[in-house]
């Protein structure tokens, strides 16, 4: 697609209404992402399949997290994460980065980009996209030689926002409090 399509999509996402709530279903996001990838495979041959998960809370609704995670990763899908850890937010989780590393991300080359303030989200997303693209050398070469201006501009442009280099974590094996959180605002308890 072209720059106008990307800009229109970004505008649509930016203009979506925010709905504060106490429920987060990371497992449902993974399931929907997997279904969308599966549906697109009729028309597109992908060299990599990646689901990006951004959020400010753990899985406290929907199906069990690790069961869903393991099924998605077994399909060859990479899951990367961008936890938003703003300590001024309602329902702040001080170790959400470790939760994402232990329960959300997975697959070959998976990673977590940590954002510490909502204001730094755009910079974190940009950093994450560059990491995802740069993990595939042929894609970088194609972007620069095929004159795909949007990808080239993103990769070459200056850092957006104050957080130029967000913290990046690799996957770990589980989370001490469990990956399914009941009553997320009341504490980390297994279902």
Question: Predicted segment positions?
Answer:
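Active-site-proximal beta-strand/loop segments in catalytic clefts of secreted hydrolases
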Residues: 1, 54-57, 82-85, 115-118
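Von Willebrand factor
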Residues: 2-48, 81-96, 124
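Sec-exported extracytoplasmic/periplasmic mature domains
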Residues: 14, 18, 34-42, 59, ...
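DG-centered beta-turn motif at the end of beta-strands
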Residues: 33, 47-62, 104
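VWA/integrin I-like adhesion module and closely mimicked acidic/polar interface patches used
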Residues: 57-102
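Von Willebrand factor A/integrin I-like adhesion domains
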Residues: 84-140
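A cross-kingdom marker for long, charged
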Residues: 113, 124-191
């Amino acid at each position: 697609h072209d720059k106008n399509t990307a800009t229109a999509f970004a505008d649509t996402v930016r203009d979506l209404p925010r709905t504060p709530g106490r429920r987060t279903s990371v497992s449902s996001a993974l399931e929907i992402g997997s279904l969308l990838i599966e549906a697109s495979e009729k028309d597109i041959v992908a060299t990599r399949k990646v689901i990006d998960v951004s959020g400010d809370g753990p899985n406290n609704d929907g199906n069990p997290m690790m069961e869903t995670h393991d099924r998605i990763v077994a399909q060859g899908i990479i899951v990367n994460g961008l936890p938003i850890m703003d300590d001024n937010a309602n329902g702040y989780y001080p170790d959400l980065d470790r939760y994402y590393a232990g329960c959300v991300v997975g697959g070959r080359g998976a990673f977590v980009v940590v954002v510490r303030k909502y204001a730094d989200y755009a910079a974190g997303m940009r950093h994450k996209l560059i990491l995802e693209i740069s993990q595939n050398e042929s894609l970088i070469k194609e972007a620069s030689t095929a004159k795909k201006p949007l990808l080239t501009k993103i990769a070459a442009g200056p850092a957006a926002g104050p957080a130029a280099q967000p913290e990046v974590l690799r996957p770990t094996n589980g989370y001490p409090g469990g990956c399914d959180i009941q009553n997320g605002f009341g504490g980390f308890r297994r279902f």
